[in-house]
Amino acid sequence: MSNPESLKKQVEPPGYNELFMVEDVCNVDLEQGLDLCKPEKVNKQSQRSRQSRQSLFTNTIKPQKDKMNIKTNKIKEFLNDLFTEFSKFHNSYYPDGRISTRSNFRWPLLIIWSIIIVFAVDKKFEVQKFLSIWINENRFYSEIWVPIAIYVCLLVLMLLSLIFFAEFAVLALRVTGVIIAVLGMIIAVLGMIIAALGATITGLLYFGHWALYKLVILSLGFKIVTPGDVCVSNTLPTHNGETALHSETTVGSDIEQIELQNMPTPVKK
């Protein structure tokens, strides 16, 4: 059988028995039942508590930061891989102003493009015919091998030009694009300036006309007759030279009266 007092001591919290043996209850460590009146003990215990709190805080925060860093790194790696795979797929991006040449179809495409250009140039300028005539005059002509050699030489020259002058062509295209953009901006700015000048000149002319109308014509007392104020009426002269207004119904009778008045009177014998 176990001692009941020992069981009671194990069940009770630490420092329970020592709590009543200390005079100042406010300066007692309730966890360990120690007197806290000495400043050394207080400082040591406060430092321990701070260290424990800091360690707890760091242990709870650091894993979250590490998880965030891992997630962001994974996202960056995924985006980089996606970009590289996409660039390999379509192979049309320009890193640092240079054309990517990793495509397996580069040389076949260059050869086909060169053949098309050679035949187009030969059809337009008849290079093969001209060179054949020149070779025939110098007695080095063959109906089969000379045209083949001419086309092969032209093809090689075209390939070399496409390979070595591609960088200059891209640079020229970039420069022309920049020049066109700058010219477009200049033309747009000039158009805006011309439109602003036109609006300003129109406003000045309108203001000048309004000032002339208000200050000169009205101040001198002139009366402006508008087209609506003019009414057209049928007027006929009378026998004594006066004018009078007549309606359309009395025009015929007035003419008859005028004719009767102008007729000579018969002379009585």
From Swiss-Prot:
This is UPF0494 membrane protein C1348.01. Signal peptide: none annotated. Belongs to the UPF0494 family. Disulfide bonds: none annotated. The chain crosses the membrane at residues 107-127, 144-164, 177-197, 201-221. It is a multi-pass membrane protein. Keywords: Membrane, Transmembrane, Transmembrane helix, Vacuole. Pfam families: DUF999. Coiled coil: none annotated. The keyword Ribonucleoprotein does not apply. The keyword Transmembrane applies. InterPro entries: DUF999. GO terms for cellular component: fungal-type vacuole; vacuolar membrane. It is found in: Vacuole membrane.
